[in-house]
Curated annotation (Swiss-Prot):
Transferase is among the record's keywords: yes
Catalysed conversion reaction: N-terminal L-glutamyl-[protein] + L-leucyl-tRNA(Leu) = N-terminal L-leucyl-L-glutamyl-[protein] + tRNA(Leu) + H(+); N-terminal L-aspartyl-[protein] + L-leucyl-tRNA(Leu) = N-terminal L-leucyl-L-aspartyl-[protein] + tRNA(Leu) + H(+)
Top-level EC class: transferase
GO biological process annotation, one example: ubiquitin-dependent protein catabolic process via the N-end rule pathway
Organism ancestry: Bacteria, Pseudomonadati, Pseudomonadota, Alphaproteobacteria, Hyphomicrobiales
EC number: 2.3.2.29
Name recorded for this polypeptide: Aspartate/glutamate leucyltransferase
Function field: Functions in the N-end rule pathway of protein degradation where it conjugates Leu from its aminoacyl-tRNA to the N-termini of proteins containing an N-terminal aspartate or glutamate.
UniProt GO molecular function: arginyl-tRNA--protein transferase activity; leucyl-tRNA--protein transferase activity
Source domain of life: Bacteria
GO cellular component: cytoplasm
Amino acid sequence: MTQHSRDTPQFYLTAPSPCPYLPGRHERKVFTHLVGNKAGELNDLLTHGGFRRSQSIAYRPACDQCRSCVSVRVVANEFRTSRNQRKILARNADIVGEQRNPVPTSEQYSVFRAYLDQRHRHGGMADMTVLDYAMMVEDSHVETRIIEYRKRTPDTGITGRGGDLIAAALTDVLGDGLSMVYSFYEPGEQNRSLGTFMILDHIARARRLGLPYVYLGYWIEGSKKMDYKGRYLPQQRLASSGWIRIDASGEHPEPQD
């Protein structure tokens, strides 16, 4: 790769393929490579413009005649838990979250594999091997962390370490927030609502770090896989005019920062 291509991002468009979220539709993506010394700055800028990261690639939907994928970010400092979310936090009071460098482990892959087999056995990631998983975690040129969620043990208060791993989240640290790249959990623990718990934990982490937002990726109205992202209010959704605030009272059309 030349110096020019490292410093000046080149954007590419994928060929149409079946949409994994809305039956009968096709998706296309525009993408670029996140490499070089300014990869972090570029990732910040692109995330603010609706892109997502996957390994060293930043991508955004660019579908013909469809704008259903809407980038959403939770306003961390103003977020208030619902009654149901408070119940989920209480249900997981025995869980401790440990932030680590993005180093893949066999323990993580075991949970990841079980999660895919139970929840996404026919999805695009279903055939990922342990080497594929390692690439997903390690292939990052931006500030990335992996948050491991473990059950507390009698020694956790002393050592700060938990016991069995039951969930994990691959997370980018941006200039204005945390971006949840991918999360997974032990399917045998589904009664804990660990997906919701990890989002709530990231909102709390963003607050402690003084970061205004938690980026959740794409909200898709009418998609059972993605509709849950609309439950975390207040949030902002990216429109053609900029980020639009959504709260319990509805939509506020004035563009946000």
